[in-house]
Swiss-Prot record:
The keyword Hydrolase applies. One of its GO terms (molecular function) is methenyltetrahydromethanopterin cyclohydrolase activity. This is Methenyltetrahydromethanopterin cyclohydrolase. The gene is mch. Belongs to the MCH family.
Amino acid sequence: SLSHEKYYALGSGPARAMAAKIKDGNEEPVEELYKELGYRDSFDSTVLVIENDAVPPPAIVEKVAAACKVDPGKLTVIVTPTSSLAGGLQVVARVLEVAMHKAHALHFPLENIVDGFGSAPLCPPHPNFVKA
């Protein structure tokens, strides 16, 4: 999650696999899952999709860019309110990701998963983000 003062949002996209932090003098992925998987992306630009109805403050953009080791101008931030069609699609599109997280939580060997497919209904947008 991303937070700064009163701003809070969930983020997804390639930036999650690039973000790193220094812990005990060593660089490691920000997200524990990527540390466990031994996976990290590296590129000169990246994208972060944010579930929120407001543009993130500059402090968050700068923090994410620094964690991904990219210039802030090379970080594309896509804001998708959950109450919008794009926001609803972004949530539904993660159905396979949720299944993979569940398999991981159950200690199923992820290297045994060769392919995956998921489907889920796309509900119409709703002005109330909780109901959406």
